[in-house]
Curated annotation (Swiss-Prot):
<dbReference type="Pfam" id="PF18603">
    <property type="entry name" value="LAL_C2"/>
</dbReference>
<feature type="binding site">
    <location>
        <begin position="214"/>
        <end position="219"/>
    </location>
    <ligand>
        <name>ATP</name>
    </ligand>
</feature>
<dbReference type="GO" id="GO:0046872">
    <property type="term" value="F:metal ion binding"/>
</dbReference>
<keyword id="KW-0067">ATP-binding</keyword>
<dbReference type="InterPro" id="IPR005479">
    <property type="entry name" value="CbamoylP_synth_lsu-like_ATP-bd"/>
</dbReference>
<dbReference type="GO" id="GO:0016874">
    <property type="term" value="F:ligase activity"/>
</dbReference>
<dbReference type="InterPro" id="IPR011761">
    <property type="entry name" value="ATP-grasp"/>
</dbReference>
<protein>
    <recommendedName>
        <fullName>Uncharacterized protein y4rH</fullName>
    </recommendedName>
</protein>
<dbReference type="InterPro" id="IPR052032">
    <property type="entry name" value="ATP-dep_AA_Ligase"/>
</dbReference>
<dbReference type="InterPro" id="IPR013815">
    <property type="entry name" value="ATP_grasp_subdomain_1"/>
</dbReference>
<dbReference type="InterPro" id="IPR040570">
    <property type="entry name" value="LAL_C2"/>
</dbReference>
<dbReference type="Pfam" id="PF02786">
    <property type="entry name" value="CPSase_L_D2"/>
</dbReference>
<keyword id="KW-0614">Plasmid</keyword>
<keyword id="KW-0547">Nucleotide-binding</keyword>
<feature type="active site">
    <location>
        <position position="339"/>
    </location>
</feature>
<feature type="domain" description="ATP-grasp">
    <location>
        <begin position="174"/>
        <end position="366"/>
    </location>
</feature>
<dbReference type="GO" id="GO:0005524">
    <property type="term" value="F:ATP binding"/>
</dbReference>
């Protein structure tokens, strides 16, 4: 196979100051070994946040929505959206301690092995004796196929699990898209270091090497020469990367050009944004803006490619985000993700177009009609705050100054002084972000630049390697 692009052959000011435990949890080892193997093992002590003054009789009258796990970026927003629809949110989680806000906000959480479908079905049945369960969903891609299976089992609205599973494997997804004539980068999958070397020689360097299954840019790297390719191959296949499936990597042609993300609900494109990344070899997003500066003709071409992706992959229910780069031959699809992108993307869509993607997803999950009408057109942009080194955060200030700037809509931090910072070239490298909204892109850029320049921090290097190694990043659901 050549390294050519393939055509048919083969992405209110709500100041979450010091949301530290989320970041702290992103820096410790995570294991599911202790998780109960069946719903029967779930104890009363495992069910957190349940209001004690609500009787079982009253519970039966309450409509509930079940969330399978949650995420670092969108999780809290999903809970808030459920409550806005006057539903009772219940999180099923292998590690309830991940969600540090549940106790303070009295959110019900049940401990269950979320990798065990039978255990989840059993827990659903148990909860069904006390609640009128209106729907089941998840913000996490890794559990979305499971959501589809549970919905099918209980005759609830939900995604097609087979389509989701196919889409979540980037190698299988790429094969389907190429067969349907959708422009994609040249690629091959590999399971051994020798295969990686062979495929890279065929495709050519630079090439992108990434896990076939995963999200959040975990394990994704641009390999510009043979040394970088060998190093990253060893990282992925040598036991350092945490796999949630059998080890399989994708070696793909590096496609250069402006990077865009389309946010979709059902089969309707709600908006297309443009993304800027930080320096290679990693793909950590630096800035995202909605709407992207596309001509009408470019927008129509992008929407056409999006629709072809949805049809080829059997998607069309619920949220999808599609990443593509614009090249000399037009849009080339990088990834199709059968979920909403993590915040700040949904925030930006709501600020730009007044469409609440998370709320509309919940409506779909409970069988209600969506309202995807765009009620305004503004420019919304987000800039990431990215640590400049590993170490311990000494201080971070200027948050109030940034938040007070007219046009700043949100300032979110994942850290506070004393938080250990370990960069890994993925979405957890962000220590926070700033969101701004304005009538034009130039105004939004001016506001966001002023806000970011108002924020300052200091990080002291770790004293030794041991200090750094004890803060291995957590495999947070996403």
């Amino acid at each position: 196979m050549s390294g050519k692009i393939m055509f048919g052959t083969a992405r209110s000011f709500t100041l979450a100051l010091y949301d530290v435990r989320v970041r702290r949890l992103c820096m410790r080892n995570y294991s599911r070994e202790w998780a109960p193997s069946s719903a029967a093992e779930t104890t009363d002590a495992d069910r957190l946040g349940h209001p004690q003054n609500v009787t079982a009789e009253a519970d039966k009258m309450r409509k509930a929505l079940i969330l399978i796990e949650n995420t670092r970026t969108n999780g809290r927003s999903y809970v808030e959206a459920v409550r806005r629809l006057r539903l009772h949110p219940i999180i099923l989680a292998a590690d309830p301690a991940l969600y540090d806000y549940v106790a303070a906000e009295r959110i019900e959480v049940a401990r269950v092995d979320t990798t065990n479908l039978d255990a989840l079905i059993g827990e659903y049945s148990r909860l069904g004796k006390s609640f009128d369960i209106a729907g089941v969903t998840s913000a996490a891609e890794s559990f979305y196929a499971t959501v589809g299976k549970i919905c099918r089992n209980f005759n609830l609205p939900g995604p097609d699990p087979e389509s989701i599973e196919q889409c979540c494997n980037k190698a299988a997804q790429r094969q389907v898209l190429a067969a349907a004539g959708v422009p994609v980068p040249g690629y091959r999958s590999a399971t051994t270091a020798a295969e990686v070397q062979c495929v890279a020689a065929e495709i050519g360097l630079p090439a992108v090497l990434k896990p076939a299954v995963g999200s959040g840019s975990r394990g994704v790297r641009l390999c510009r020469d043979a040394r970088e390719l060998a190093e990253h191959t060893d990282y992925l296949l040598g036991g350092k990367h945490m796999w949630r499936s059998s080890p399989e990597v994708l070696v793909e042609q590096f496609v250069d050009g402006p990077h865009y993300i389309a946010e979709i609900m059902g089969d309707e494109v709600i908006g297309i944004g443009i993304t800027e990344y930080g320096p290679p070899p990693h793909f950590v997003f630096r800035q995202l803006t909605f709407p992207a500066p596309l001509t009408d003709e470019q927008y129509e071409r992008a929407v056409d490619v999006v629709q072809r992706c949805l049809r080829a992959l059997g998607l069309g229910w619920g949220p999808t985000n599609i990443e593509f780069r614009w090249t000399e031959v037009g849009p080339v699809v990088i990834e199709v993700n059968p979920r909403l992108a993590g915040n700040p993307d949904p925030q930006l869509v709501q600020l730009a177009f007044d469409v609440d993607l998370i709320g509309e997803h919940i409506k779909l999950a409970i069988g209600e009609q969506c309202n995807l009408s765009k009620r305004q057109s503004r420019t919304a942009t987000a800039r990431s705050l990215i640590a400049d080194r590993d170490g311990t955060l000494d201080y971070i200030d200027g948050i109030d100054r940034a938040a007070a700037i007219p046009g700043v809509a949100d300032v979110k931090l994942y850290v506070r002084p004393g938080t250990p910072i370990v960069r890994n070239g993925d979405y957890c490298d962000r220590i926070g972000y700033v969101v701004a909204v304005a009538p034009s892109r130039s105004s939004a850029d001016t506001i966001i630049q002023r806000a970011v320049e108002s924020i300052d921090w200091s990080i002291s290097p770790f004293s030794d390697l041991h200090d750094q190694e004890q803060y291995t990043p957590l495999y947070f659901p996403d």
